[in-house]
Amino acid sequence: MGLLSEGSPLSWEETKALADHVREHGVNQFINLYHRLKDRQGDILKWGDEVEYIIVKFDDEQKVARVALRAQDLLAQLNEKELADPNGVKSLWRPEYGAYMIEGTPGKPFGGLMAHFNLVEANMRYRREEVTELLAKDECVMSITNFPRLGAPNFTYPLAQPRPEDPLSSARSLYFPDEAIFPGHPRFKTLTRNIRKRRGEKVSIKLKVFKDTKTKLPVEGAPPGEPDVVLLDAMGFGMGCCCLQLTFQACNITEARRLYDQLAPLCPIMLALTAASPIYRGYLTESDCRWNVISSSVDCRTEEERGLAPLDQQKFRIAKSRYDSIDSYLSPEGAKYNDVPLTYDEKVYQRLVEGGIDHLLAQHVAHLFIRDTVSLFSEKVHQNDNEDTDHFENIQSTNWQTMRFKPPPPNSSIGWRVEFRPCEAQISDFENAAIVCFVVLLTRVILSYQLNFLTPISKVDENMQTAQKRDACRKEKFWFRKSSKTTEQRAAKAQAQAQAQAKAQAQTNGKATLNGNGLANGNGNGSENSDQEEQQPLTNGSAKMNGHGSGTTNGTNGSSNGSSNGTDSDHTDTDDEENELFQLLSINEIFNGKPNVFPGLVPLIRSYLQSMEVDTDTHCTIEQYLRFIQKRAAGELITTATWMREQVLSHPDYKQDSVVSERINYDLLKRIQGIQEGKQVEPALLGQDYHSKTKTKDFIPPALQKQLAKNGCCEEK
């Protein structure tokens, strides 16, 4: 969930008094960090996923399912392996907001080998099994985005009751007890309390109820004058949801900024594809996704900042919550698509510019810094700005956006990274692995083909709202950039060059660095390099990418320094192309293509893969993932959200009143348990026998490792 500093949390009054102190020193820390690391080059591709889980307890006698408040106990046991052998564990476990939630990641990041795609699902299975071994027979670990009856009466085990009138309560919620907040670190309750106090009132999350034939209005707890609203009133309703996130290491800062920008327009598209949360507080709603719920759950803006009162005590009108979609692009190519006025702190901006930060990055940081810190620890108030970054991370980590631009940590081997944050958690490891591998492959296609998905920020914002509508994946259309002839020619040229070079290299010395076991890192990998570069042979430095081969042509320096060096022109559209660049496309058209408009994300990935030699098992696994993505995008398979709705609407106990009763909730979660264990076949959701199709393994076979070593692409151990 972000920075977990150790120490004693300050009260809101103490934290508020230090807001400018944190802001001033956070800016200084970023400037110092930037100048230390801005010229860092040559980091290899590394990537990893984060899956959040909910622990569910079943009462099979009473036919009731509740969230089990066991996270602290489970984490203590799960972390024993890491403490004993930090470098040898296959998974890492961290706390999340809910006392019923845990977050799992791979023990080590995956790298640039094609074979790594075959490890992801197996590692996810291992994580699930690792937790399951610690659970009682009536408990289950589930990768569901939201517990359907979160906030309904008696939803926790042990039972806990909200205390809205208790001044010592962090949430003061009518529905969400403090006991459901993770107790093992003070950050979570501190954030809950301080967000409420800064706002001046409890957070207000409003969802339209799904109106069925017998839905009773007003909904229980609905605000005055809004009878059809399901009201949620605590941070836990949002931060108590689970998601699926990915982080990529770029070769340098320029590539990180480009990836940040190119992936941002895809965030609402992936949100719609992964929609998985239609039920809140035991009611079917008109929303399929968690995003606006979380956004409202941490909205600490005052009435002045929200435009409900004249500015007096506050400096800014702020358009969005601190949890929302990005507000500006970072790369030079994206600048002209920053079409929404950006609110930022002018003093912070000037300090950054004077400190040597360029305009686009300076306004991005200055925009983050319009927010006050909402969590501060006494031991972290005074820091060394030349070495520490906690004040910067304090603000950075509490701006939860669809994308996150992440500088390297101090004194670390980790490079510049970007985090992809919109996806909802899926029921099965197969689905989660498919989403992860698809997005990683897409980043390689973007860099290798120099694709341009840049879309005006205003249209991306519009897409974010569209993505959350009921059954948006099948019914809605999204603003998307048309493919240009330049893009199509570039992709075809890159593919042809890669295949020709691989063949030539193999014939020349038998040591083909383009053996298909590597993935490109470095935005110089596009086909539009100079003629001189294109004629140069593939040396170890240019092709191996520090042990990770490239699928396309690249420059001579291996890491392709990611600088502009003529590549910016690949992203610059002609005046003719600027006309009617953007069209409303369906999810099917975006993923599978529309003739003469856009080739489709999946066909682009398949084109890229044709230039790579992939071992048989990995090829089989990737193919199953791509087919799954294609079928869901086409509507042949339904989203988790749609499947959940259908399960509720067809349940014999459902009374056409929008209510998900305890029995319906129990049966739904039991069915989900069967799916994730491979015992329940759901053709509409996953097709037939999905779980037996992939060839996922938790290791790279020895024979393949020998081949990789022979070809100079050694697997890191």
From Swiss-Prot:
GO biological process, one term: response to copper ion
Protein name per UniProt: Glutamate--cysteine ligase
EC number: 6.3.2.2
Recorded catalytic activity of this chain's protein: L-cysteine + L-glutamate + ATP = gamma-L-glutamyl-L-cysteine + ADP + phosphate + H(+); (2S)-2-aminobutanoate + L-glutamate + ATP = gamma-L-glutamyl-(2S)-2-aminobutanoate + ADP + phosphate + H(+)
Keyword Nucleotide-binding set for record: yes
Biased composition (Low complexity): 492-518, 551-567
Pfam families per UniProt: GCS
UniProt function note: Catalyzes the ATP-dependent ligation of L-glutamate and L-cysteine and participates in the first and rate-limiting step in glutathione biosynthesis.
Protein's pathway: Sulfur metabolism; glutathione biosynthesis; glutathione from L-cysteine and L-glutamate: step 1/2
Root EC class: ligase
Region (Disordered), start-end ranges: 484-576
UniProt family annotation: Belongs to the glutamate--cysteine ligase type 3 family.
Example of a GO cellular component annotation carried by this entry: glutamate-cysteine ligase complex
One Gene Ontology term of the molecular function aspect: ATP binding
